[in-house]
Amino acid sequence: MIVEVFFRNFYRNFAKFEIDAVDKREFAFQPFSGGMVRHKSFKSLEDLRKFVVEKTPRHIYHSAAYYERPGEEDMERKGWIGADLIFDIDGDHLDTEACRESKIVSLRCLEDAREEANKLIDVLIQELDLKPTRIVFSGNRGFHIHVSSEEVMKLGSRERRELVNYLKAVGFDPSRFIAKLGRRKVVLYEEEAVGNLLRIKQGVEDARAMKVEIDEVVTQDIHRLIRAPGSLNGKTGLVALPISLKELDKGVEYIVDKAIAFRKGHLKFKFEKPVEGPVLFEKVGGREGDVKVLPAYVAIYLELQEFGKIYD
């Protein structure tokens, strides 16, 4: 499979994984042939890289959790130490016009996801005093926000569920809130900190402004697997790209362009489904049965999305 050859070359020569405490993480891999290989562990990033070059999986994941024995197959015997707090913002979950109508990676939909990521980061920093450790473009339609700190590491599923409810404004009732003088906070009558005045004001005017659209299952699961930062997204061929807050603010065109892994060369592609419009900055038009020469990253994206096949 030509795409697999491109993936192997990337992992051999260009991949830069950004994963903390590798020796305490469980890793999982989805091969190009399908299925899932779980409960793998590695002593170092170099050991991980060697394995990936040899096996060349389509998807690479690691656990949000840290374990004493990450390679143990029995979850009860892994020895759970703690877990990062992970937030997943995905265009598939955003009820916006751009995301509803998007069948392929749309810059408009991704811009909606970027705005939601910025909203989440503002809430984490300003209201919860939690600083994101890593911001990652997923390589597809969204962003992953990682928080790694002692204060969140030991949170159980119940506490994480409560945090999800807060972020999604579950049960929000403006009449229950009062401003606390001398601070840019609002509190419950029970003196429980709940957020800054601007978001509460917006929430009173429009309940949707209070909500942060995260995938709640990802955040509350203390054993969750998340796409490995620096790996290739097997649905697109783009890099799951760690970015800074400044890079997030540069916009989605900058981010997607930086995430393109296969910039060199062209490939012959036979369409099995019609495509008309921009695909990763490239204007593409093809009907079923058409054969066209496309930039490598576009052809790889279209094959992974099952729009057709790359020809030798």
Curated annotation (Swiss-Prot):
Keywords: DNA replication, DNA-directed RNA polymerase, Magnesium, Manganese, Metal-binding, Nucleotidyltransferase, Primosome, Transcription, Transferase. Signal peptide: none annotated. Pfam families: DNA_primase_S. The keyword tRNA processing does not apply. GO terms for cellular component: DNA-directed RNA polymerase complex; primosome complex. Catalytic subunit of DNA primase, an RNA polymerase that catalyzes the synthesis of short RNA molecules used as primers for DNA polymerase during DNA replication. The small subunit contains the primase catalytic core and has DNA synthesis activity on its own. Binding to the large subunit stabilizes and modulates the activity, increasing the rate of DNA synthesis while decreasing the length of the DNA fragments, and conferring RNA synthesis capability. The DNA polymerase activity may enable DNA primase to also catalyze primer extension after primer synthesis. May also play a role in DNA repair. Belongs to the eukaryotic-type primase small subunit family. This is DNA primase small subunit PriS. It comes from Pyrobaculum aerophilum (strain ATCC 51768 / DSM 7523 / JCM 9630 / CIP 104966 / NBRC 100827 / IM2). The lineage of its organism: Archaea, Thermoproteota, Thermoprotei, Thermoproteales, Thermoproteaceae. The gene is priS.
